[in-house]
């Protein structure tokens, strides 16, 4: 079971680095708007704030442009574009802008609609006869508008994309085979491949290519002569940045290879400079006009920047743009994240104000800081009053626990509440009245926290967290209003089974200590179905006593090999080698989780591998009663196991997958079933892992062999380039 857990965690770790979320727009303390004569001091404050944040987040370099009233009022490079040689960033340094590309693709669509070449309510099949979806009703009704507003019903299907082995038509076909996670138009689900389909449909409608249309219809008329859609062109320029990631645990900056995504180019392939991107912002702020020439109709701009679907709370999505309010002002924005680069484009139409921030590090939160700082300094923050009196913040202080066992801390700092999430920066909580708060800078947009009494238990408190990917309830476990708890290692309820008794029954259920210890190694052959991705995998998962583990997987789509992954852990150190992503070395919490989870004798050694074991409460999994056991290691992340009261086998596991470089912790749930006795040991032949990023991943064991002679080098980094 532990080997399957590592397989699923590995793929989720990759997904973390590709996750794109809207950026926060944050309220600030009252501050008057800057006047034209005050720009110098306001711009100096902006630069100071962002330089401090850049250094804090380990960002080698960035370039910022600010546009106000159709004029560039700030344009500067900060830091370095080449970390190794310390070459400075300039205003003309090219960076990858990632998903900020989507607004350009949407612009091409509305331009084409202006010309009558297509309608936003056309079916993509009109231009792409091969386009289809697994849901036949959705396939019959889906429109270009649905593709451009992330409401196709599909979860992210990025796995096939990142391998780089499929062309655009193949990627679209793979997405069409993926199992949907919602009905058409039911909810917002970020979808890169649907944007690739939209861009390809526009190209077919115009009898051209997406790259040519971007150059002809947008770059050329805007004078964006320092922009491109291909890495090869970027690298031929005289001034471009390398891309990097930064490990917050080891403080190491690493150069990354640039990711070419020609097949999904309409979703994120543009490279540009701050100077060029100023022209793009001017076009949007001038309602489709640049230097007196109209490039797109006012109706087209309205389509781009009006609500097409709600994401969560006040956060909406247009066509290629996130939409919301900031102190009564409409804000239109979109971030971008791709290997080694992160971007933020944002503008405030009624203030004729916008900016572009380009950085050379993966998955940075600095865009949120830029937005809040620039709005505060140049627009000003009027005094505001909450819709209802704020409750006493002191009573909200304490620890809150996610279903996956991750603890969130709420504390007071300068008489204001702060939410701290493991592995992330602290988020100030801004009161919206009563016990409702907005998560401040640098939280992603659309995150809100409401403290409330537990239903039918008014004396206890819970935290209701609203987020774009789905809401979650966290139970308060310490502080006023917390459910009473006991010392670690005991039961949370005296009527529950003790930890020692539970472990004894589990050991017996899995085959007994003698049977478990008689084996010294195992090799499992597995088939994996990424149901919501349209991708499959086959491979082996190997383990050897006392705590060595390895995995070798081959991924396929449309019957074609698209990639490989090897993971390895020798008992002390390890990592991952992939054909489609940079090599990863385990560190920080990720390494600690691997250490705790790789013990060959698993449940026999839980007491040694985890600092605390606590039977928290009773629960149900699929109608079956379970004990919920929390496992906490010294430095890793907590795990919740749901153990059948009948069979004493683990039916479900809640945990988190950590990426030290992407700076995320992604909750996942795994369900274990089809237990079979293999040479005296119970093995779950089916595992279903679920996360917001990957959807359902179904793993089936096809063969188990015990006590195979596995050489030491199987648990070391591969010596060849087989997996590159």
List the predicted regions and their residue ranges.
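A short, polar/charged loop-to-alpha-helix boundary motif
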Residues: 81-90, 365-373, 660-669
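Gly/Pro-enriched, hydrophobic low-complexity segments
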Residues: 441, 558, 622-718
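N-terminal mature ectodomain segment of secretory-pathway/periplasmic proteins
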Residues: 207, 501-504, 508-582, 608-617
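Active-site helix/loop module of the DD-peptidase/beta-lactamase fold
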Residues: 61, 91, 96-100, 112-155, ...
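N-terminal leader/targeting segments and the immediately adjacent pre-domain N-terminus
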Residues: 2-10, 14-89, 95, 111-119, ...
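Flexible, processing/modification-adjacent segments and terminal tails
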Residues: 385-391, 490-502, 507-508, 568-637, ...
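Catalytic loop of the DD-peptidase/beta-lactamase superfamily, centered on the K-T-G motif
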Residues: 28-75, 159-162, 203-216, 238, ...
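Short, charged, amphipathic alpha-helices and their helix-cap/turn boundaries
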Residues: 42, 46, 161-183, 208-225, ...
């Amino acid at each position: 079971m532990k080997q399957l857990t590592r397989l699923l965690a590995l793929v989720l770790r990759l997904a973390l680095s590709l996750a794109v979320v809207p950026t926060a727009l944050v309220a600030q303390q009252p501050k008057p708007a800057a006047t034209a004569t005050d720009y110098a001091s306001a711009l100096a404050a902006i630069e100071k704030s962002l330089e401090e944040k850049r250094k804090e987040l380990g960002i080698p370099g960035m370039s910022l442009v600010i546009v106000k009233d159709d004029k560039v009022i700030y344009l500067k490079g900060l830091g370095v574009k080449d970390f190794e040689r310390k070459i400075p960033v300039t205003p003309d340094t090219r960076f990858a802008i990632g998903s900020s590309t989507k607004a350009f693709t949407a612009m091409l669509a509305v331009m084409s609609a202006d010309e009558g070449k297509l309608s936003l309510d056309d079916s993509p099949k009109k231009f792409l006869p091969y386009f289809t979806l697994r849901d036949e009703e959705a396939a019959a009704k889906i429109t270009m508008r649905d593709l451009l507003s992330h409401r196709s019903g599909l979860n992210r299907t990025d796995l096939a994309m990142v391998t780089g082995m499929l062309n655009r038509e193949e990627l679209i076909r793979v997405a069409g085979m993926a199992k949907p996670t919602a009905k058409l138009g039911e909810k917002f689900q970020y979808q890169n491949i649907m944007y690739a389909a939209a861009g390809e449909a526009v190209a077919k409608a115009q009898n051209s290519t997406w790259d040519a249309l971007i150059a002809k219809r947008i770059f050329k008329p805007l004078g964006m002569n320092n922009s491109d859609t291909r890495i090869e062109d970027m690298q031929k320029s005289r001034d471009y940045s390398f891309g990097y990631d930064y490990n917050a645990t080891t403080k190491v900056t690493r150069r990354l290879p640039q990711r070419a995504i020609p097949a999904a180019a309409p979703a994120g392939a543009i490279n540009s400079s701050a100077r060029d991107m100023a022209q793009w912002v001017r076009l949007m702020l001038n309602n489709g006009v640049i230097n007196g020439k109209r490039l797109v109709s006012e109706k087209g701009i309205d389509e781009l920047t009006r609500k097409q679907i709600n994401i969560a709370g006040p956060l909406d999505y247009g066509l290629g743009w996130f939409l919301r309010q900031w102190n009564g002002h409409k804000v239109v924005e979109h971030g971008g994240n791709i290997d080694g680069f992160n971007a933020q484009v944002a503008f405030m139409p009624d203030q004729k104000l916008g900016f572009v921030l380009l950085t050379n590090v993966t998955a940075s939160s600095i865009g949120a800081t830029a937005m809040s700082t620039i709005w505060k300094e140049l627009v000003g923050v009027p005094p505001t009053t909450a819709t209802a009196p704020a409750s006493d913040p002191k009573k909200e202080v304490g620890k809150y626990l996610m279903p996956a066992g991750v603890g969130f801390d709420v504390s007071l700092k300068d008489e204001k509440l702060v939410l701290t999430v493991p592995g992330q920066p602290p988020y100030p909580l801004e009161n919206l009245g009563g016990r409702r708060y907005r998560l401040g800078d640098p939280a992603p947009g659309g995150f809100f926290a409401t403290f409330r009494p537990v239903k039918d238990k008014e004396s206890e408190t819970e935290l209701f967290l609203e987020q774009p990917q789905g809401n979650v309830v966290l139970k308060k476990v310490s502080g006023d209003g917390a459910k009473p708890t006991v010392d670690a290692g005991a039961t949370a309820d005296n009527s529950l089974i003790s930890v020692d008794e539970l472990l004894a029954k589990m050991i017996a259920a899995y085959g007994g200590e003698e049977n478990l210890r008689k084996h010294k190694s195992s090799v499992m052959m597995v088939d994996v179905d990424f149901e919501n991705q349209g991708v499959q995998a086959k491979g082996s998962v190997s383990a050897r006593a006392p705590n060595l583990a390895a995995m070798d997987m081959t991924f396929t789509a449309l019957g074609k090999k698209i990639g490989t992954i090897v993971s390895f852990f020798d008992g002390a150190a390890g990592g991952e080698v992939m054909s489609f992503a940079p090599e990863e070395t385990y560190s920080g919490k990720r390494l600690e989780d691997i250490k705790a989870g790789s013990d060959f004798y698993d449940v026999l050694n839980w007491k040694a591998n985890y600092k605390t074991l606590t039977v928290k409460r009773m629960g149900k999994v699929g109608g079956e009663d379970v004990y919920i056991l929390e496992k906490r290691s010294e430095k890793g992340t907590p795990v919740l196991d749901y153990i059948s009261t009948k069979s004493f086998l683990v039916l479900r596991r809640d945990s988190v997958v950590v990426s030290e470089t992407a700076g995320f912790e992604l909750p996942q749930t795994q369900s274990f079933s089809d237990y079979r006795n293999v040479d005296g040991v119970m093995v779950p032949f089916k595992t279903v892992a679920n996360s917001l990023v990957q959807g359902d991943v179904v793993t089936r064991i096809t063969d188990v062999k015990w006590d195979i002679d596995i050489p030491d080098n199987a648990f070391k980094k591969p010596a060849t380039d087989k997996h590159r």
